[in-house]
Every structure is written in C-alpha cells, then in structure tokens.
C-alpha cells in the first residue's frame, strides 16, 4: 500500500535509545517482560507510553501485550501520552479488608493531606501482611503497623528499599 509511516504507535527515538541502553545485552525473551517492566519502573519511577512502545519494539511483541501486562499489575505506574510525570516518590496504602479495619482509610487521608502533590499517595491492593495491618509501602519499603508518623519518618529518611531477612 505504500504508506509513508507504519501503522500503530509511532516510536520516539529517545525512548527507543533509553530502553535499548537500559536492557543492554539482556535477552529479549517474552518471559522476561515483567522483569523489564520492573526495570523501567524502578529506573524512571513510571512507565511512559513511549517507553512501553519502545520495550514492545525491542522485545518484538505487540504493543497491546506489553500494555495489558503493565496495566494488570498495580505496582506499575503506566502514563498515557500527555500525562504529567509523577512525583519522585509514591506511597501505597494497602486497602485490604484487614487494613481497612485497622485504619488504612484514615492513614491514606492523613498522608494525602500532609503531602499534597509532593509525594504521590495512592490506594493499593492487598500486600499480604494482614498480621501487621495497616501497611503502607514507601517506594519498596513496607511500613508495618503504619501510622502517619511512621510513614513520614520513612519518607524523610528516604527509606525506600526493601528489607531482606538475614
């Protein structure tokens, strides 16, 4: 048909370059998609539409497949074209029934009031720590028996990495 452009989402050259550099010499296997989505999320604090399209191209998978996987999981922050970049830090507050009963809704409201838009505060699905509810996740660090002060302390200390047991 001789189209002057390809069908579908047009790739952004800088995004293609960034994703290619980020993946380096890692294999472009379909079963590594989630791992690479985590890599993009951790590097850029979000997954832009341009980066998602570039990843799909790099891995030679349909854009729809990459998008479906990225948007299925609550931990990935997928931005649509034109969306403003997210704040540098996200605090996720567990919304499981147990966390709700232990005050998660009030915790969410208190944190949102305190941080305004400087730190992104969002609801999150169950984090599997019902025995220490309510739970909040600062970056990748879980604050158990979370209170506004405990979460603020983790944010202030930039305690954003997971703790691994000895």
Which positions does each model-derived feature cover?
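Feature of Fe-S/electron-transfer and energy-metabolism proteins
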Residues: 1-166
